[in-house]
């Protein structure tokens, strides 16, 4: 779990997301509260439940990007799901319990990686011994068994030194490696993914752990042997329990597009993919026990962050019980021209940096001037105002159109310097931006 302070979390998010300080502060506080709760004594810790968040804002302002970046910072089980993928229990489609199953799978994978990393040093030693056994087979006794020698031979020590220095990396050896389990692919009908995954694991376990000889270069064999030895050092049952604990205490679920499951007007018949999904989400958010293939998971202390554009529906269109379980409301603001300018220049891997790097592979040096950046931002904002407002995503559309000619002719422009200033942008975009009908289809 991340031990970063709220200020550090916001600072890290600022490297990738422009503006939306309120949303950043809310998720930073929520993430820090996970750590604070774990410092309490056990009795009080059980009573402190997470304050779930509802992020409201137009499309393309950074809701999903905040979730993506938060996943990397959290160092905790994290899953992002689309609310529109689910239907009410009993109907064709995914049921909401699969959110917790997927979160548990993600936790098992995360904990396994951490456990393997923790045992890597010991695994490297064991892998080294196995390679040395192939290079210098140990002496055998009268019964054909390898003798345990008290001290490694001088030749073995010499080869160990060469192996560590990388002198033997390109030498080819034949070594026994664990064979891949029998592959059985079962296509799951909607809603039955859990049953099919259990069937798959059953078929994979039928073959047992077989080994087969493979010819590999030593550097490639070393990587595979380290992974194999590290996996042997991990206790699967302990790993599952650690993963379930991580989900229950630190798990975070991000539900995107929650506004799309709001009830719209008076409809007749069951509303299985809207209000039905909201009703099914209630026990998950409130706290219940979900059965997974790794064990039973309690959802009482899992943090839920929901987000939606709410352009057609309103937050009040959610059923009252679900509104009550999302107590913290954060409104994200629509982006302005100055925000667009900052998006083009400030993030670590901004769109302009990406284009410059892509063109540099062809030997073309692209330079964006301040006036060019300003004109691109104005063009994107203008198209958003006159057509549909899709936020920062409009910058991708505008830049792709602007760079189209350079991208197409890049191989013929090797060694050239191209400056993209206000004049260049106006020449390539003004006609499209001014013609509302054209910009509707092209930008």
UniProtKB/Swiss-Prot annotation:
Keyword set, alphabetical order: ATP-binding, Chaperone, Cytoplasm, Nucleotide-binding, Stress response
Top-level taxon of origin: Bacteria
The keyword RNA-binding is assigned to this record: no
Matches recorded under Gene3D superfamilies: 1.10.8.60, DNA helicase RuvA subunit, C-terminal domain (1.10.8.10), P-loop containing nucleotide triphosphate hydrolases (3.40.50.300)
Binding site for ATP: 18, 60-65, 256, 321, 393
GO annotation, biological process: protein unfolding; proteolysis involved in protein catabolic process
CDD domains linked: RecA-like_HslU (cd19498)
Signals that turn on the gene: By heat shock.
Disulfide-bonded cysteines: none
Entry GO CC: HslUV protease complex
UniProt cross-references to InterPro entries, sorted A to Z: AAA+_ATPase, ATP-dep_Clp_protease_ClpX, ATPase_AAA_core, Clp_ATPase_C, HslU, P-loop_NTPase
Secreted listed as a keyword: no
Pfam families: AAA, AAA_2
Subcellular location(s) of the protein: Cytoplasm
One GO molecular-function entry: ATP binding
Family under the similarity heading: Belongs to the ClpX chaperone family. HslU subfamily.
Assembly mode: A double ring-shaped homohexamer of HslV is capped on each side by a ring-shaped HslU homohexamer. The assembly of the HslU/HslV complex is dependent on binding of ATP.
Matching NCBIfam families: hslU (TIGR00390), PRK05201.1 (NF003544)
Known function: ATPase subunit of a proteasome-like degradation complex; this subunit has chaperone activity. The binding of ATP and its subsequent hydrolysis by HslU are essential for unfolding of protein substrates subsequently hydrolyzed by HslV. HslU recognizes the N-terminal part of its protein substrates and unfolds these before they are guided to HslV for hydrolysis.
Name recorded for this polypeptide: ATP-dependent protease ATPase subunit HslU
Organism for this UniProt entry: Salmonella typhimurium (strain LT2 / SGSC1412 / ATCC 700720)
């Amino acid at each position: 779990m991340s031990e970063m302070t709220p200020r550090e979390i916001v600072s890290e998010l600022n490297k990738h997301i422009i503006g939306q300080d309120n949303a950043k502060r809310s998720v930073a506080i929520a993430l820090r509260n996970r750590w604070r709760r774990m410092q309490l004594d056990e009795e009080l810790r059980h009573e402190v439940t997470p304050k779930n968040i509802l992020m409201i804002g137009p499309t393309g302002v950074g809701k999903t990007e905040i979730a993506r970046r938060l996943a990397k910072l959290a160092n905790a089980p994290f899953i992002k799901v689309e609310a529109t993928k689910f239907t009410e229990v009993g109907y064709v489609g995914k049921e909401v319990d699969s959110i917790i199953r997927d979160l548990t799978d993600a936790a098992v994978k995360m904990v396994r990686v951490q456990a393997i990393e923790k045992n890597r040093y010991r695994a490297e030693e064991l892998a080294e011994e196995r390679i040395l056994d192939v290079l210098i087979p140990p002496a055998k006794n009268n019964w054909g068994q390898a003798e345990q020698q008290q001290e490694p031979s001088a030749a073995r020590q010499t080869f160990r030194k060469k192996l560590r220095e990388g002198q033997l990396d390109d030498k080819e050896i034949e070594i026994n490696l664990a064979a891949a389990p029998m592959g059985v692919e079962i296509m799951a009908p909607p809603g039955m993914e859990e049953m099919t995954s259990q069937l798959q694991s059953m078929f994979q376990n039928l073959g047992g752990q077989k080994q087969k000889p493979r010819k590999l270069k030593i550097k490639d064999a070393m990587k595979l042997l380290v992974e194999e030895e590290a996996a042997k050092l991990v206790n699967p049952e302990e790993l599952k329990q650690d993963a379930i604990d991580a989900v229950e205490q630190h798990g975070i679920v991000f539900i995107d597009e929650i506004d799309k499951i709001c009830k719209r007007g008076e409809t007749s018949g069951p509303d299985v993919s809207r209000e039905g999904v909201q009703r099914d989400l209630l026990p998950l958010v409130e706290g219940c026990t979900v059965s997974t293939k790794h064990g039973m998971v309690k959802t009482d202390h899992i943090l839920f962050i929901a987000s939606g554009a709410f352009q057609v529906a309103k937050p009040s269109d959610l059923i009252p019980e679900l509104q009550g379980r999302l107590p913290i409301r954060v409104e994200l603001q629509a982006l302005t021209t100055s925000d667009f300018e900052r998006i083009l220049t400030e993030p670590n891997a901004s769109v302009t940096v990406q284009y410059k790097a892509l063109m540099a592979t062809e030997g073309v040096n692209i330079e964006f001037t301040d006036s060019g950046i300003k004109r691109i931002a104005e063009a994107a904002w203008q198209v958003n105002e006159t057509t549909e407002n899709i936020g920062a995503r409009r910058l991708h559309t505008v830049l792709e159109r602007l760079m189209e000619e350079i991208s197409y002719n890049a191989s013929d422009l090797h060694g050239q310097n191209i400056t993209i200033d206000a004049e260049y942008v106006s020449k390539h975009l003004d006609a499209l931006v001014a013609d509302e009908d054209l910009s509707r289809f092209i930008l």
